[in-house]
Amino acid sequence: MIKFSATLLATLIAASVNAATVDLRIMETTDLHSNMMDFDYYKDTATEKFGLVRTASLINDARNEVKNSVLVDNGDLIQGSPLADYMSAKGLKAGDIHPVYKALNTLDYTVGTLGNHEFNYGLDYLKNALAGAKFPYVNANVIDARTKQPMFTPYLIKDTEVVDKDGKKQTLKIGYIGVVPPQIMGWDKANLSGKVTVNDITETVRKYVPEMREKGADVVVVLAHSGLSADPYKVMAENSVYYLSEIPGVNAIMFGHAHAVFPGKDFADIEGADIAKGTLNGVPAVMPGMWGDHLGVVDLQLSNDSGKWQVTQAKAEARPIYDIANKKSLAAEDSKLVETLKADHDATRQFVSKPIGKSADNMYSYLALVQDDPTVQVVNNAQKAYVEHYIQGDPDLAKLPVLSAAAPFKVGGRKNDPASYVEVEKGQLTFRNAADLYLYPNTLIVVKASGKEVKEWLECSAGQFNQIDPNSTKPQSLINWDGFRTYNFDVIDGVNYQIDVTQPARYDGECQMINANAERIKNLTFNGKPIDPNAMFLVATNNYRAYGGKFAGTGDSHIAFASPDENRSVLAAWIADESKRAGEIHPAADNNWRLAPIAGDKKLDIRFETSPSDKAAAFIKEKGQYPMNKVATDDIGFAIYQVDLSK
């Protein structure tokens, strides 16, 4: 016993002599979507609100504030802007360096992971792109279908030289692991089916963290391209960050995917979230928005007093590049990065400026969430015409009526960007305008759905709206921003219908039934008659919707055919063809849907948010289907309009 005590004492003395404290900063970008420049290619104008060339200034400042730092990217990097479109159209051969990696290499990133949109262009394109990165990538849950092994390096433990508080050099073994939503198997089925499988995010991290610790990792950092939800855990959940914070051995979570900001007030009600400290169940976590509008910063203090490194203090924050309230830039351009990107930036501007046709009228999306809209109409017109031409001569498909489903993609972001609306002016149209009207490189897929399924599809779309109390005169918000993504608000053309917002939603934002007796879709007709529940229809949509299986009438068993063409290319070709045939396109909405009139003797105060611009105000005055008047501006900058649905 005496001998044991002496040994223990010697160990404690040795640990005390070698004790050190290290401050480590982990910085993160996420969901850059190829927005390298502070430039809005859709409007052909500079911006102070996004772009890595501005985030770079925050990165440089954050680095200079501390002795020890690392920088990670959380994915959705190579897709999502006209720069990405330009590179995809140009093609990326072996040896070519994608502009995003010219930028990230210049900023000396430490490690990166993959987002779901990395798979949009196929595995070969992704492989060629990743070859240009001068830093390693990790992903643990995408599995090679042939070898049954991880397709990418699942995790990495990097020996990192740091300086402790006494100025002495120490070595930290920092472990990085990456994960991506399993839903990529549906979203990019054409690119991934038979080539990869994807495992559950939480179980993957739970499996690997002990292994990383056994191999010597002093710190474990999870790069999770996944959002934050407090819903009960489900296997293969898309948004799994909350569950990751409950896994022992995880020291920091750098996340994204949801285009939101954590820590932030939107997440204050989640149990276990400390917005002041930036922690989830005690684990520091950060999600820095999108397009470089924020830099994520996690600060860890580590001590090895016990003989091994342990986190003793932790906090996280998301630093903005722009002060929305005061309309002021908080980050200057990084001139070195601007110069690095100049040639690709100029080429992108040329690429999106190619003329494709003409429009007889303006196309703005200011009212796309409250009435039928020209920006959605032209997409549906193009998709419907494409499918009707495609099925000619097919004895099985040609006899079926064609419908088309499209959603508004630019209607204020996730209620975080009052400038994010489609603004296509009448006159000459370019590829820039087609890309503005259809943001994503989705491919056109056609599903076969029954009349009953079309009705249920629309019922899920109607979850876009909050339930309105017809007996209340208090202000009521019409748009369900928190529980429903606007890109799921499908408008189906080829049928006519009304949406009764006084009824409860039948489905939640994930198309899970929540009120079996509720029905919001009223007066659904096809060719002027009530739709036959048993009649079959072809519905043109995109690969995300068709393969996702979330909406009624979608999923593998419903696929009628998969076209080789992107929806955006279909739209551009339709604009060109119509302009050749008729001189210009006429993008007026056909008003096949509307919000059902709310009867009653009370004057309701129903409100919705949209762009605060004078252009929006003029458009609303001219094109509004219901009486609308502006009553306020919210703290983010959205204009708040009151709408009269009594008629």
Swiss-Prot record:
Keyword Hydrolase: yes
Top-level EC class as recorded in UniProt: hydrolase
EC number: 3.1.3.6, 3.1.4.16
A GO CC term attached to the entry: outer membrane-bounded periplasmic space
Catalyzed reactions: a nucleoside 2',3'-cyclic phosphate + H2O = a nucleoside 3'-phosphate + H(+); a ribonucleoside 3'-phosphate + H2O = a ribonucleoside + phosphate
Residues given in the record as substrate binding sites: 440, 544-550
Database matches in Pfam families: 5_nucleotid_C (PF02872), Metallophos (PF00149)
Entry-linked InterPro entries: 5'-Nucleotdase_C, 5'-Nucleotdase_C_sf, 5'-Nucleotdase_CS, 5_nucleotidase/apyrase, Calcineurin-like_PHP_ApaH, CpdB_N, Cyc_nuc_PDE_nucleotidase, Metallo-depent_PP-like
Compartments where found: Periplasm
A molecular function GO annotation: metal ion binding
GO biological process: DNA damage response; nucleotide catabolic process
Highest taxon, organism lineage: Bacteria
Binding site for a divalent metal cation 1: 31, 33, 76, 259
Primary location group: periplasm
Signal peptide from the UniProt entry: 1-19
Alphabetically ordered keywords of this record: Hydrolase, Metal-binding, Multifunctional enzyme, Nucleotide-binding, Periplasm, Signal
Cofactors required: a divalent metal cation
Record: residues binding a divalent metal cation 2: 76, 116, 225, 257
Function comment: This bifunctional enzyme catalyzes two consecutive reactions during ribonucleic acid degradation. Converts a 2',3'-cyclic nucleotide to a 3'-nucleotide and then the 3'-nucleotide to the corresponding nucleoside and phosphate.
Membership in a protein family: Belongs to the 5'-nucleotidase family.
Additional comment: Two kinetically distinguishable active sites for the two substrates (2',3'-cyclic nucleotides and 3'-nucleotides) have been identified.
Protein name: 2',3'-cyclic-nucleotide 2'-phosphodiesterase/3'-nucleotidase
Organism: Escherichia coli (strain K12)
